[in-house]
Swiss-Prot record:
InterPro entries for the chain: UPF0178
Similarity comment: Belongs to the UPF0178 family.
Pfam families named in the record: DUF188
Species of provenance: Citrobacter koseri (strain ATCC BAA-895 / CDC 4225-83 / SGSC4696)
Protein name as catalogued: UPF0178 protein CKO_02784
Length: 152
């Protein structure tokens, strides 16, 4: 099992949580980005640099992830694709994407895209709060416990 990170858009504070968790869990953590990233020295943490371009990092994550892996992303279409492969998906705010919620999320995303395309200012998400960080760490631990139960 591997934790994959859509790293270009992942907040640094979330990456820090993931670095510590990867060491604690002794789980491979792969950060996929179209730029060089600095990561702490570790036998569990590595980066995968992809060429710049629309959805290049997303496509690489989809290509390489497997059932049972975890993907960290705020990209709803990417989350949908990895769920289809049997991987879990978690956004940086700690919201777990599921088969039952992803359709609604995709519909809302498409609706917001339509509003923006028509010139309506929709605003962006609030900045990551301490509560969001705690929620992310808790959901990451919850996923890890599920993995441990399945592999016993």
């Amino acid at each position: 099992m591997t934790i994959w990170v859509d790293a270009d858009a992942c907040p640094n504070v979330i990456k820090e949580i993931l670095y510590r968790a990867s060491e604690r869990m002794q789980m491979p953590l792969i950060l996929v980005a179209n730029q060089n990233l600095r990561v702490p020295p570790s036998r569990f943490i590595r980066t995968l640099r992809v060429p710049a371009g629309f959805d290049v990092a997303d496509n690489e994550i989809v290509r390489q992830c497997e059932a049972g892996d975890l993907v960290i992303t705020a990209d709803i279409p990417l989350a949908s694709e990895v769920l289809e492969k049997g991987a879990a998906a978690l956004n940086p705010r700690g919201e777990r994407y599921t088969e039952s919620t992803i359709r609604e999320r995709l519909t809302m995303r498409d609706f917001m895209d339509t509003l923006r395309a028509s010139g309506i200012q929709t605003g962006g998400p609030d900045s990551l709060s301490p509560r969001d960080r705690q929620h992310f760490a808790a959901e990451l631990d919850k996923w890890w416990l599920e993995v441990q139960r399945r592999t016993r």
